[in-house]
């Protein structure tokens, strides 16, 4: 790549990452301050904080990988650094998806209205189950992250060296194919939490439809709190599903780069697209949460006041 292309792509990557990190840091900070003030944290705040912190780590790893790829490509020839980056990328990637799924499940059980005994049993205990569920997600993510480092053999590291023209050999192709297949298989595991979120979304839609029909029969209107809660939860879940699909497409671009002549450019483009998912979803969550939205309005008002004071 040319120097101008490198500079432009790095600038875009840094801007995307910083915006996302600020959004997720805001979520974590507001919930942490609320925890310190009230000496307790609600289940929804715990999920949002865990999700925000996992995405901050994910964005830092993606940005670090972009910087290394452009500025220090020879780093990928050293096994230790590559293993660390790959491990934490896989870990934070899985954590982000699993925590977002926990958020979808929480919205479903808290807001939806069904009368099945199992649903009601979980609905009444969902607040107590959240911490255990998040810990289980952490353990699962750790288990899924370990296998990816086992395929980073010396042969593979020599094959991904960007300065050498040995990518056409059969041995390199086999090594890269094996590594890529492991990454693809590990990410296929994320289809399960994605499916759970999709089912939660569909059931929320069903619950909203039943609720609106009931409102029509009672002639009470559509602006009741339950309808508003349904709509907000549905928006949060559908935004996650759409952005996650975009993220998966970006991952496929980055993974397929092992078989492309301009692999460095393909990886960076994949990572630029991947950064959209954790960055934009954080602001959707802020706008959909009344406490976070009010806090963001207060911050913006203070910033506006400070800027006016400096002007005069």
Curated annotation (Swiss-Prot):
Keyword field contains Oxidoreductase: no
Residues spanning the membrane: 10-30, 50-70, 102-122, 129-149, 188-208, 236-256, 267-287
Swiss-Prot/TrEMBL GO biological process terms: detection of chemical stimulus involved in sensory perception of bitter taste
Keyword Transmembrane helix among record annotations: yes
Protein's organism: Rattus norvegicus (Rat)
Tissue expression from the record: Expressed in subsets of taste receptor cells of the tongue and palate epithelium and exclusively in gustducin-positive cells. Expressed in 15% taste bud cells in circumvallate and foliate papillae but only in 2% in fungiform papillae. Expressed in the duodenum, antrum and fundus (part of the stomach) and in gastric endocrine cells.
Topological domains annotated Cytoplasmic: 31-49, 123-128, 209-235, 288-312
Membrane-side (Extracellular) residue stretches: 1-9, 71-101, 150-187, 257-266
Protein name per its UniProtKB record: Taste receptor type 2 member 7
Record localization: Membrane
Membrane topology designation: Multi-pass membrane protein
Domain of life: Eukaryota
Location, primary (coarse class): membrane
Keywords: G-protein coupled receptor, Glycoprotein, Membrane, Receptor, Sensory transduction, Taste, Transducer, Transmembrane, Transmembrane helix
Miscellaneous comment text of the record: Several bitter taste receptors are expressed in a single taste receptor cell.
GO molecular function, one term: taste receptor activity
Carbohydrate attachment residues: 151, 167
Any single GO CC term annotated in Swiss-Prot or TrEMBL for this entry: membrane
Its biological purpose: Gustducin-coupled receptor implicated in the perception of bitter compounds in the oral cavity and the gastrointestinal tract. Signals through PLCB2 and the calcium-regulated cation channel TRPM5.
InterPro entries: GPCR_Rhodpsn_7TM, TAS2R
């Amino acid at each position: 790549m040319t120097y101008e292309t490198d500079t432009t792509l790095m600038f875009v990557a840094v801007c995307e990452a910083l915006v996302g990190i600020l959004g997720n840091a805001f979520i974590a900070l507001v919930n942490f301050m609320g925890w310190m003030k009230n000496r307790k944290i609600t289940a929804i705040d715990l999920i949002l904080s865990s999700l925000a912190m996992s995405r901050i780590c994910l964005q830092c790893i993606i940005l670090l990988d972009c910087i290394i790829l452009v500025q220090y490509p020879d780093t990928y020839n050293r096994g230790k650094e590559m293993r660390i980056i790959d491990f934490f990328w896989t870990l934070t990637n899985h954590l982000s998806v699993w925590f977002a799924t926990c958020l979808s499940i929480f919205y479903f059980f808290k807001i939806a209205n069904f009368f099945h005994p199992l649903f009601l049993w979980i609905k009444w205990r969902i607040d107590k189950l959240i911490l255990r569920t998040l810990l289980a997600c952490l353990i699962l993510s750790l288990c899924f992250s370990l296998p990816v480092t086992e395929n980073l053999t010396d042969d593979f590291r020599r094959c991904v060296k960007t300065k050498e023209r040995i990518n056409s050999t059969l041995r390199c192709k086999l090594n890269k194919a094996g590594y890529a297949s492991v990454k693809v298989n590990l990410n296929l595991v994320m289809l399960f939490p994605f499916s759970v979120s999709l089912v939660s979304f569909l059931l929320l839609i069903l619950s909203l439809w039943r609720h609106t029909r009931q409102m029509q029969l009672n002639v009470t209107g559509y602006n009741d709190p339950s309808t508003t809660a349904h709509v907000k939860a549905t928006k949060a879940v559908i935004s996650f599903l759409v952005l996650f699909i975009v993220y998966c497409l970006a991952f496929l671009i980055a993974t397929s780069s092992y078989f492309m002549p301009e692999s460095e450019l393909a990886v960076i483009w994949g990572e630029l697209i991947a950064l959209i998912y954790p960055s934009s979803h954080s602001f959707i969550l802020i706008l959909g949460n009344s406490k976070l939205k009010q806090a963001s309005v207060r911050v913006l008002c203070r910033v506006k006041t400070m800027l006016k004071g400096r002007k005069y």
